[in-house]
Amino acid sequence: MLEIIKRLEYYAKVQPQSIALQIDDEIVNYENLYQKICDCTLNSPKFKLGCRVALLNDSPIVNITNYFVVLMMDGVPCFLDNKWSRDTIDKLIEHFHIEYVMTAIGKFKRTTSFGTYEKYISEQLKVDDLLHIGFTSGTTGLPKAYYRNEPSWIASYVENEKLIYNYEKALAAPGPLAHSLSLYTCIYALYSGRTFIGQRQFDAKRFISILNEQHSNIALFLVPTMLHQLLNVDTTITHIKSIFCSGAKLSESLFKTVSQQFKNANIIEFFGTSEASFITYNFNQTSPTNSVGQVFPNVSIKLEAQDNRKIGLLKVQSNMIYSGYVDVGVVQPHSWIETGDYAYIQNNQLYLVSRKSDRLIIGGKNIYPNVIEQQVKSLDGIEEAVVVGEPHRRFGEIAVLIYVGNQELDYTTLRRYLRQTLSRYEIPSKLVRVKDLPFTNSGKVARNTVQTLYLEGAFKV
């Protein structure tokens, strides 16, 4: 039996009336949650060990209850995002051999993949203590499915706990449970006997109101885009003690604003991926400006194919990594995995320079967009910046800066500023100011979408 199931049973006995889940105005205590899970398990049809079951309901409480029902029955829950198109959901069910779907509490419905058990079970059984199958939030193509086992998340909880200093009894994440960060937070809360606070759909004003009603200290887990929306709500909440932010680095100006509005909170920025889990942390921006933070003590770093500036492809090893992509092969604990980032490291601080797929080659030289973007975002009045490539006959491609800000950048002034730290090949050839930029579900700028829009002429130069 998984440790999380044992813990739910324990908390149902020793703190039965403690709130386990609060989603908007809906509240469930530990006793009722565990009893509902047990009742549904007893009344559900039996299936084979490791059978894959999709969770697809509008209610997070229904989904998380079904999550544990599937685990109690030795199945594998697969969290699907109900905001995906019907076509995407059908393709995922078929491609990854998901045999059942649960659209209501305790109710199983066979899918078109029913009977495909033998096609996937041999690989899946190589994963010890499998918790669920998650899906990446890619901007193009079908989301990738990956295995997440329980020991890797328990290891993450251990490291997370070291960064919580104020006895936070509630963990809040307003994002969908289909997203790794919110599901992680929910299971973390239940594993540690805390209250999980979430929402059906993110509403900054309503979320702040719910947090205001709490009587215990709170730790928030969210992405920068959501944090930015919370700042637009007038509030003086004093019992938010920790803000864990993942997905993209906070600009200095945004960090300052967050610090002023949530005066009693420590702000911890994580860098990591769905596959690698946590890699680095930046506590109250005490790390160097362009760094994504200090490497976690249980994470090892390796940089491959380094250039003369010691920039290389980032690989990580830890007890927090995933167990591999579905249908690609199982990754054993403590294996080295590639993140797809170019990076360098100094004094145990990690510096990202580009995604592998984002690197530009201008005049035969490797140019890393993130380096340019960080310099631009350090300017007053610049909210967001992304550098994309445009084909060029002479140089192969040139860099184009697309930015959001309350001021128009003067090219000559910007060039003079950037030349202090960047080479001439890294200076963007064109500047484009836009009102806003598209983001992924994980809170990152949708770079591929931005490049496509630019090349199609959607942005005016």
From Swiss-Prot:
Q: What is its EC number?
A: 6.2.1.-
> What GO MF terms are annotated?
medium-chain fatty acid-CoA ligase activity
PROSITE patterns tied to this protein: AMP_BINDING
Q: Do you know which SUPFAM superfamilies this protein is assigned to?
A: Acetyl-CoA synthetase-like
- Name the InterPro entries for this protein: AMP-bd_C, AMP-bd_C_sf, AMP-binding_CS, AMP-dep_synth/lig_dom, ANL_N_sf
Its keywords, alphabetically, are:
Fatty acid metabolism, Ligase, Lipid metabolism
Leading EC class: ligase
User: To which protein family does this belong?
Assistant: Belongs to the ATP-dependent AMP-binding enzyme family.
Task: Give the PANTHER family listed for this entry.
Answer: ACYL-COA SYNTHETASE, MEDIUM-CHAIN ACYL-COA LIGASE ACSF2, MITOCHONDRIAL
Annotated protein name in UniProt: Putative long chain fatty acid-CoA ligase VraA
Q: Which species?
A: Staphylococcus haemolyticus (strain JCSC1435)
User: What gene is this protein a product of?
Assistant: vraA
